[in-house]
């Protein structure tokens, strides 16, 4: 084992985050919480951030509708720097179980299942996810 691997083991796994649609939308729509999300969005990359494909859909749609195509494409460009996680049948089954267990909607269940699958902390202001242990809730 090389020195880097030993150091990595002592420190434990690197913290992975998942920025919920709420955070991306706040940031790119210049919402009231944009500054709170800025450190996460601006440092997001494939090494430290996972993004469910359904989040790409939600963010692109809402930003395009509110701010236009150029701003929506900027949001997509930033999200595409992260590790985009496709919805597989296994992830869909896990999301369905989460939906049943916590009475969450489809998108929130997919986000939570993705976070669990990648051992990621969810960064959000979504009230539906606030009670989940892996959530860092940014208050309004």
Functional labels for PLM-detected ranges:
Residues 19-20, 51-53, 104-105, 126, ...:
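Histidine- and aromatic-rich ligand-binding microenvironments
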Residues 57-60, 96:
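Amphipathic alpha-helical segments within well-ordered protein domains
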Residues 1-16, 81-82, 112-140:
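Acidic, PIN/NYN-like endoribonuclease modules and their adjacent C-terminal/linker elements
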Residues 61-64, 116:
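Short glycine/serine- and small hydrophobic-enriched flexible loop segments
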Residues 84-125:
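Active-site neighborhoods of divalent-metal-dependent phosphate/nucleic-acid chemistry enzymes
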Residues 1-51, 63-74:
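Short, well-structured N-terminal submotif of metal-dependent ribonuclease cores
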Residues 24-25, 56, 92, 129-130:
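A generic structural signal for short hydrophobic patches within well-formed alpha-helices
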Residues 66-70, 102, 138-140:
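Short, hinge-like loop/turn segments at secondary-structure boundaries
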């Amino acid at each position: 084992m090389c020195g880097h691997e030993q150091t990595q083991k002592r420190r434990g796994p690197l913290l992975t985050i998942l920025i919920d649609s709420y955070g991306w939308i706040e940031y790119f729509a210049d919402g009231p919480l944009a500054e709170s999300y800025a450190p996460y969005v601006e440092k997001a990359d494939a090494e430290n951030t996972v993004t469910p494909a359904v989040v790409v859909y939600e963010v692109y749609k809402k930003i395009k509708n509110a701010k236009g195509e150029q701003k929506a494409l900027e949001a997509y460009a930033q999200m595409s720097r992260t590790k985009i996680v496709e919805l597989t049948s296994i992830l869909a089954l896990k999301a369905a179980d989460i939906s049943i267990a916590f009475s969450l909607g489809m998108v929130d269940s997919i986000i939570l299942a993705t976070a669990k699958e990648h051992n990621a902390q969810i960064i959000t202001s979504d009230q539906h996810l606030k009670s989940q242990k892996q959530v860092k809730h940014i208050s309004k």
